[in-house]
Amino acid sequence: MRIFGSLVELVILDVDGVILDILGGLHKNLEETAVHFGLSLDVIAQNIADIALGKLRIRGNARDSTHTLWPHLSEAEVTEFVDFFEEVERRSPYGLIPGSLEIISFLRDAGMPMALATNNHMKSLLWRLEAAGIDPSWFAAIVTKDNRYFKPHPQTFDPIFAAVPVPRDRALYVGDLQIDWDTACEAGVSFIAVLSGGVPRRAFLHEGVQADHIMNRLNNLLECMEL
């Protein structure tokens, strides 16, 4: 399969913001958790607005985000917050971004090996996928924050290439955050940015992502594929 004219033998996907519509419920879930702990809600709206304006570079995991929102919290308090937040997420899981399941099914039917690379922990990822009707066995490898190396470490994708031994220049990573771009660059893997995670086009352009490699959402890949 060729994407943008280049031979691709492996597609690696982020999860939140690429497959799952985290924007559809993140604000609500954060607010519910903040209310439980008596924390300010104003910083949540400001944080999301800053991301949408491209002012904030986020790392894509709950612990770092909690530190950013409420820097006065101790490590123990952050742990409490994250644990409760994950309970809230599990009660109110994120839905699929329109077209994401269809493109995954298309790639599977075409025989394209796929992998996941996310900064979720595995236990969180598994119930996220289950709630969305996605079988983890569809993916040849999965990298989470439980791995020795995770985004943006240069060796993040090593377990994926151990499972699917293709040249790195024939792999493609699709992500929704600047940290995903960093990871792809460090690993020597081609990158496509999607805007469905809330980071604006101009932020990716500022990072150096090619304009035609920035898409609204994952299923736009169909428009640049050649079988």
Residue ranges of each PLM-predicted region?
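Residue-level marker of regulatory loop/turn positions in helix-turn-helix DNA-binding domains and
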Residues: 96, 117, 149
